[in-house]
Amino acid sequence: MTSKRRNNGRGKKGRGHVKYIRCTNCARCVPKDKAIKKFVIRNIVEAAAVRDISDASVYEVYALPKLYAKLLYCVSCAIHSKIVRNRSREARKDRTPPIRFRPMRGEGGQNARPGQANKLFNMSPRK
């Protein structure tokens, strides 16, 4: 039978069995090597309240703690929540991670937004 992917959608090479984990979203059992992993680092305090807390703090330079979470998704939940997308047969062979959006100062002192990257850098949109 033909294979859709070189790794059959898994990271298991030479191992007979891999432990199962539960999907963060739907609690489905998924092999650990097949699960789509997403590591999220967020501030515990939302951005709107950071200034209020820093003003009310006794310490002048207090670094607010961050929330670290490793999210593990089954394939269907990852597709549904747009963490991964369907790709063409040729694009599936490309194993490089997607380019991450990093906000930079744009023209006129405005913060760049994901939808306006083309205007700031005169790039054509991806298809």
Swiss-Prot record:
Record GO biological process: cytoplasmic translation
Entry's transmembrane regions: none
Pfam family, one: Ribosomal_S26e
InterPro entries associated with the record: Ribosomal_eS26, Ribosomal_eS26_CS, Ribosomal_eS26_sf
Localization: Cytoplasm, Cytosol; Cytoplasm; Rough endoplasmic reticulum
Family to which the UniProt record says this protein belongs: Belongs to the eukaryotic ribosomal protein eS26 family.
Protein name stated in the entry: Small ribosomal subunit protein eS26
